[in-house]
Regions:
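Conserved phosphate-binding loops in nucleotide/dinucleotide-binding enzymes
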Residues: 517-532, 625
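Generic long, charged, amphipathic alpha-helical segments
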Residues: 373, 562-587
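Short, highly charged C-terminal tails/helix-capping segments
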Residues: 620-636
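Extracellular/periplasmic helix-exit of transmembrane alpha-helices
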Residues: 540-553
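Amphipathic, heptad-repeat alpha-helical segments used for oligomerization and assembly
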Residues: 223, 388, 392, 582-594
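C-terminal structured "cap/appendage" subdomains that terminate the fold
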Residues: 586-603, 607-614, 619-620
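Structural alpha/beta core scaffold segments of enzyme domains
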Residues: 1-511, 572, 601-614, 634-641
Length: 641
């Protein structure tokens, strides 16, 4: 058979995989499923997503003496670019320097797939002994780069009369394209998040990595988590409609906790669980039940426009699932005028990483942020870096920078205390408001730095951090792949036109856990942006390929990302102010990816509006993206029911 393999089903039929299947679970699923009073099953086709970064793929290669090469690239992973360029040029890594000042957006699309353009530029620069820039036009960029993995998933669930889940089986099937890229880790994360915030009872989760004749799909914000998490919400909706109970009641009834269970299907204890508190607070502050009553009455009296309401949780694991990537380095210099330069391994792509890193350094030295310069990410300053991905940028690099700063403040404190004849009190020295203080003695920071220089104290230090507590055994399917979980909840209200399938998102209320926020303005911006991007994935962003596997939604005219008019009329984001119980940087939490999945509440609200046509007895089949066409088809199916 030489016909192209473009779908999960056709790849499964051909047993075409890019990587081996993985599975894990707990309990006796067959027995619990057989004993369950009620059973339900379902399938869901989940679309991919184009990254649509503002700046496309671009690299500049400049040859230097002795076979050295300088690379300026738009990449989330400078060390991988360095490694691959060195392989292409057949030189050692120390001959290649990669400089990354900032990207015009990345979202995962420049984690691995930026490297090939740097390699092409470097090869041509080496052969022709001149600088070469390789930049892709937007349409070419869309054709040749990988997307978010499309998935086609299946579930079966057994539950009791109250809606308590007793047994779950899930098949998580990722369309990986023609090569593995990061698909192993992406399908793993989809499996790790197939429970979302719910205890699934006895469970068995299988993850297939399917090979198809498409571009090699790659990382995208959430990294498989959204494609797994949406299955948990589809499952909950199915249970709720089967029992004719409000979905929020079923959601709260199955949250991890003492009355259900606290261990995930992969054997990790859910500690410091904030979801019950977050959901109850949003339920109250968002007036869920009053609005549910009003919407039910509205739908009863409105023949064409139907409203939907949904409150959904997010529980997202923070750490790279590949353990070795959970490390970071930093290099901090203090100059004799008291100014400070910070180098670290993270990359800035508009998410505010350098701003937070600058704040951390300023706080450690007791200085204003204008005394801190965060440099470009360079492989000759901090080597062997991990990609800026998995929401880990601040967690890893912030801790590494803090480690270097503590080394330097310790040296300066010892120098200051010794100069006062109080060497035994060096641990009492404080760095505050541009001054160094010990008891009644105080000296401006810049003066102490100058004095330390004359005392031959080193004013440069490297820092390092590795995330603790991580382990996972693929053979047994058990471990702790995440340092902690970030939590959140979203309450969305929508209106659909049952004649056309068109809809509006009328109101969104979000309560999200970022620990003790390093920068509330940045964190709120990340939550808002992630939500809108997630909403686009679930509603308007429709990737289409022809029968030969060629992308035909290849430009901004045929591929619709959310516009300003798609922003909810009422859009309220609140931070849940609770310190991270784990020892993260200043007890903050990662914020890059978790809010993306808050947008699942919009998809659930659309289904809720459609379900009203059946008296809330039907869980409509609504594959993603839920375009107006798909919504209309679901409406017609509900009306026919």
């Amino acid at each position: 058979d030489t016909s192209p393999t473009l779908t999960v089903d056709s790849a499964l039929a051909k047993q075409s995989f890019v990587r081996p299947t993985h599975e894990f679970g707990q309990g006796n699923v067959e027995q619990q499923m057989a004993d369950a009073t009620h059973k339900a099953s379902g399938t869901l086709s989940i679309g991919g997503q184009e990254h649509m970064y503002l700046e496309g793929q671009v690299s500049l290669a400049i040859p230097d003496e002795d076979d050295r090469m300088k690379i300026y690239t738009s990449s989330q992973h400078p060390s991988e670019v360095q490694k691959l360029v060195a392989e292409v040029l057949d030189v050692k890594l120390h001959r290649v320097m990669v400089d990354m000042r900032r990207m015009g957006g990345g979202f995962g699309g420049k984690e691995t797939q930026a490297a090939q353009w740097a390699c092409i530029a470097a090869l041509l620069a080496s052969r022709n002994h001149c600088a070469v820039k390789c930049r892709l036009p937007r349409q070419v960029d869309m054709h040749v780069t990988g997307k978010r993995h499309p998935f086609e998933n299946r579930f079966e669930v057994g539950f009791d009369d109250t809606g308590r889940i007793l047994a779950t089986h899930m098949d998580i099937n990722g369309n990986c394209g023609h090569s593995p890229d990061l698909s192993d880790a992406i399908v793993d994360r989809a499996m790790f998040h197939a429970d979302n915030g719910y205890y699934l009872g006895a469970s068995h989760i299988v993850g297939h990595r399917l090979k198809t004749n498409m571009v090699s799909h790659t990382a995208y914000r959430g990294f498989g988590g959204p494609q797994g998490m949406i299955m948990a919400e589809a499952l909950i909706d199915k249970v709720a409609r089967h029992l004719e109970v409000d979905p929020l009641t079923i959601r709260k009834r199955n949250l991890y906790g003492e009355s259900t269970g606290t261990v995930t299907p992969y054997g990790m204890e859910v500690e410091h669980n904030l979801l019950p508190e977050i959901m109850t607070k949003l339920e109250t502050d968002g007036h869920y039940w009053a609005r549910r009553k009003a919407i039910t009455a509205f739908n009863r009296n409105s023949p064409v426009i139907k409203k939907g309401l949904a409150l959904t949780p997010v529980k997202f694991g923070i750490s790279f699932t590949a353990k070795h990537l959970n490390q970071a380095g930093a290099l901090v210099h203090i100059y004799t005028d008291g100014s400070i330069q910070v180098n670290h391994g993270g990359t800035e792509m508009g998410q505010g990483l350098h701003t937070k890193i600058g704040q951390i350094a300023a706080n450690e030295f007791g200085l204003s942020v204008d005394m801190i310069e965060v440099t470009a990410t360079r492989t000759d300053k901090v080597p062997n870096t991990s990609p800026t991905a998995a929401s880990s940028g601040t967690d890893l690099n912030g801790k590494a920078v803090q480690n270097a700063c503590i080394t330097l403040t310790t040296r300066l404190a010892e120098c200051f205390a010794a100069s006062l004849g109080m060497a035994d009190q060096a641990n009492m020295v404080r760095f505050e408001h541009g001054n160094v203080i010990l008891g009644e003695h105080s000296k401006p920071f810049a003066e102490l730095v100058q004095a330390a220089y004359f005392e031959r104290v080193s004013l440069s230090a490297s820092g390092f951090y590795k995330t603790p507590k991580l382990h996972y055994n693929r053979d047994t399917g058990e471990g702790r792949p995440f340092f902690y979980f970030a939590y959140g909840a979203s309450l969305s209200e929508v209106s659909i036109d049952t004649l056309t399938g068109e809809y509006t998102v009328d109101r969104v209320d979000i309560l999200h856990d970022v620990g003790d926020s390093l920068n509330p303005a940045i964190d709120k911006g990340q939550i808002e942006g992630a939500f809108i991007q997630g909403m686009g994935w679930l509603t308007t962003e429709d990737l289409r390929w022809n029968e030969a596997g060629k992308l035909i939604s290849e430009n901004m005219a045929t591929y619709k990302i959310p516009a300003i008019g798609d922003t909810p009329k009422h859009f309220d984001v609140q931070l849940f102010g609770r310190k991270n119980a784990e020892d993260s940087i200043y007890h903050s939490k990662a914020v890059g990816e978790p809010p993306f999945m808050l947008a699942i509440s919009v998809w659930c609200a659309l289904k809720d509006a459609i379900s009203s046509l059946s008296g809330y007895k039907l869980a409509p089949q609504l594959d993603t993206p839920a375009t107006p066409e798909r919504v209309l088809n679901a409406v017609l199916a509900a009306q026919g029911q």
